[in-house]
Swiss-Prot record:
Motif RX(4)HXY motif: chain residues: 75-82
Uppermost EC category: hydrolase
PTM entry text: Modified by cognate antitoxin MJ0435; probably at least 2 successive AMPylation events occur on Tyr-82.
Source organism of this protein record: Methanocaldococcus jannaschii (strain ATCC 43067 / DSM 2661 / JAL-1 / JCM 10045 / NBRC 100440) (Methanococcus jannaschii)
Keywords of the record: Hydrolase, Nuclease, Nucleotide-binding, Phosphoprotein, Toxin-antitoxin system
Protein name per Swiss-Prot or TrEMBL: Gamma-glutamylcyclotransferase and putative RNase MJ0434
Length: 222
């Protein structure tokens, strides 16, 4: 199960700030001649890469202006070349790329803090329809209304033993619209559904029995 993205963002920010601390008032020559400094910086770049790899794909796609892949691969390159590190490249990353990444991470964290009170609607068609499951997961039963989504079908996935949904033109699924789900609760649902492992979360439109339309999230089998 994935952790809250803020945990990984904090890991990235912490490593960036430690790199800044390690290299403060240091020159390129200092870096080239200090094995201790090299090891400390490389280790932090490794941690940044590992944290990036654990960010959900949906999150990375939302902020796709950030070169996540390059930072994650940089970590792999450094590991492969551990006994022959390209010090020039590493120093360039420290002085040029790391400050840019820090700026972007701070912007994202500020945005997440502003959006933490956002509310969402979730279309449930399986376990999340059950009140006892909702109480177990989020300690409350949100307002629920019956609804339908078009262009999808519900099926029993024998590989994992649960119901899933997938796109299918001309089909529909009847279920429950869970209203006013908080950002934290949405994260709990993501974890419960093993987001990015077995399921993806997609925005769509659900229609209630009285014809009202709701923007909802639906979990689809990968």
């Amino acid at each position: 199960m994935r952790k809250d993205v803020k945990i990984y963002l904090n890991h990235i920010l912490e490593s960036i700030e430690l790199i800044e601390e390690y290299t403060k008032d240091k020159t390129e020559d200092d870096f080239f001649t200090s094995k201790f400094l090299q090891d400390a910086v490389i280790r932090r770049i490794e941690i940044i890469g590992e944290a990036i790899k654990n960010l959900p794909m949906e999150f990375r796609e939302k902020y796709n202006h950030i070169p996540w892949k390059e930072f994650a691969e940089m970590r792999d390159i450094l590991i492969r070349k551990y006994f022959g590190v390209d010090l020039g490249l590493t120093w360039e990353v420290v002085k040029k790329d790391i400050p840019k990444l820090k700026e972007e991470i701070l912007k994202i964290m500020e945005e997440l803090d502003k959006n933490k009170n956002n509310k969402y609607n979730v279309f449930a068609y399986g376990e999340l329809m059950k009140k006892e499951r909702l109480l177990e997961l989020i300690n409350r039963v949100p307002k629920m209304i019956e609804g339908r989504v078009y262009g999808y079908e519900k099926f029993f996935d024998e590989t994992i033993g649960y119901y899933g949904a997938r796109k299918k033109e001309g089909s529909y699924i009847d279920g429950i619209i869970l209203l006013d789900i908080t950002d934290k609760e949405l994260g709990i649902f993501d974890d419960y559904e093993d987001l990015d492992v077995y399921y993806i979360r997609e925005k769509t439109t659900a229609v209630s029995e009285d014809g009202r339309k709701y923007d909802v999230y639906i979990y689809l089998r990968k």
